[in-house]
Structure formats: C-alpha cells, structure tokens
From Swiss-Prot:
Keywords: Antimicrobial, Disulfide bond, Fungicide, Plant defense, Secreted, Signal. GO terms for cellular component: extracellular region. The keyword Cytoplasm does not apply. Belongs to the DEFL family. It is found in: Secreted. GO terms for biological process: defense response to fungus; killing of cells of another organism. This is Putative defensin-like protein 162. InterPro entries: DEFL (IPR010851). PANTHER family: DEFENSIN-LIKE PROTEIN 163-RELATED, DEFENSIN-LIKE PROTEIN 184-RELATED. Disulfide bonds join C34-C77, C44-C63, C49-C71, C53-C73.
Amino acid sequence: MAKQLCSYMFISMFILSAFLALPSAEGGATIKKCVVDVKLSKPCTFQECQPLCLQKYNGNGLCPGDDNNICACVYNC
C-alpha cells in the first residue's frame, strides 16, 4: 500500500512539474490588435465587410451599428 501511495505521489509530482514548466499564454509575446475603419458607399453588411477586411488586412470585418457606412477591420499588427 505504501509503495502504491509513493508511486501515485511521484506521478502526480511529475505531471504537476510538467504543467509548471510549460510557458504561460499571458507571459509570452503579446499580439497587438489594430482596427481600421473603411468608409463604404452604402450601409455596411457582413457579406461585404468580412471579405474586404480579409483581403486587405487578413483580418475580421465588423459592422458597428445599424445603417452605418463604416466597416471596422480588426487584424494583428
């Protein structure tokens, strides 16, 4: 019984040390996000905004608000 307990403790310590050795997502290199507003000739729609931002900036397109002529492109700087 004591051998089994010792084995479980050793395995638990090994797994815990492996998790502690992994780099954390917070402490690593931070990815900076940029936003560009693109003025459109007509009200923004997701079907127009998303491909435009993907092609120009390799990012995501958002239409802030209703009946707005602005497409907001969010991408990694």
